[in-house]
Structure formats: structure tokens, C-alpha cells
Amino acid sequence: TRGTGAKKILLRAVGPTLGTEFNVPDALAHPTLTLYHGSTVVDTNTTWGGSAELSAVFTQVGAFPLGATSADAALVENLDRGAYSAIVTAPAGSSGIALVEAYDADPGSPPAEIVNISTRALVGAEAKDTLIAGFAITGTTSDTVLIRGVGPSLGTLFGLRRALGNSHVAVFDSTGAQLAANTIWGRGGRGDDNDAEDEDRENDLDAASDRCGAWHLPRGSNDSALLLTLAPG
């Protein structure tokens, strides 16, 4: 978050409900959600407990309901500006699929705002190994978003082992129609060698990264990125 004042955020780690309500196989049976500011634990939750306060926030932000006795996890926090991490863990000896969500619970209260959100996961070429990150644009006007699939730079810049060597990012609407895709961030998928267009694209993406507090991707890397103006949805 950035700006002045606190920002109210809803965080959820949905596991059991993925299985019971959405028939997701191998859903995580008992997620634990822990919020960090740097290395400091801000709050943690294991079972949301059917809280009336949390239920009201679910409704406010348009999140699907959770069963009052489900073992899903949820937190509502008022966060000062800074970088935070929401980490989902499983009990010892278990694993499964979880949905991690972050909602702006007071979107009409600037100047505090959510600037960017990122997630790290192990991905592969098969559909079951795809990382899916959804987002929603509310209101009545279009908004411009920067979407990046960072793989190689995690290794070269941050020393992360097993970093993906060549990432691919695609954006779909709610009907499943593909809106855009990219494999090499400095090229727009044309398949030619237009250096001037490539440089313009890289400059635009660098400027967008600056505006939302993201680091610059190295020129020539096989990371992927898209800068899109999208209608509400």
C-alpha cells in the first residue's frame, strides 16, 4: 500500500470451500493464513469461525460466502503504508490447492491505496501446473494495469533457485476469451526484429513499473509483461 492513512484490506485463504462448493480436486483441507510486514507477524488465522464482522465484509466486497463452520481462513486488517506478505501454509505432512485473495475493503477512501500485488508459485507447462491470478476492475471507467510473469529475473537478480527459464503470461476475460498474451516482455509478439518498437515498448513498461513500485525487468530477459487498458469486469 502507499499514500497516507491506513487501508482496510480483506485477506482470505480458501481451501475446504474450493472442494465442497467448486469441486476443486486436492483442495487444501486446513489452510493457515499469516500476514507479515517484513519479518514481523501482523496477524494469523486458521479457522475464520463464521464471524459476523467478516461475513459483512465478504458481502461488501463481493466475495463468495464461506461456510460458518468451514476451516477456511480470513483476516480483516487496517494497514499503514508499506509492503506486506500474506503466506498460506498447510499442517505438517499435508498439502493441497488453496485460493489466496486480497480485497480493498474501502475503495472509496483515498489517499491510501493498493499499488501492486504479486505471488510466487511453482509452475509448469501442463494446465494443472498453471498459476492463475484473477483480478477485478470495478466502477464505470476503464483502468490501465501492468501484468508481469517474472521467471528468469528471479534467478539472475534475486538468486532464486529453480526460477522459470521462460515465462508466458496471458489475460482472459470472465467468459474465457483471451485478450492478450506475451512471452518476451521486450517484444509485442510480432515475430519480427523492429528495434525501435521494442525500445518504445520497453520504455513504456519501465515507466509503468515505476508508477506502481515494481523493479525494472532486465533488457533482453525472457520474462513476460503486458500493459493493458481494460474495461470494468
Regions found by a protein language model. Name each.
Residues T1-G233:
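A sequence-level detector for low-complexity, Ser/Thr- and acidic-rich stretches
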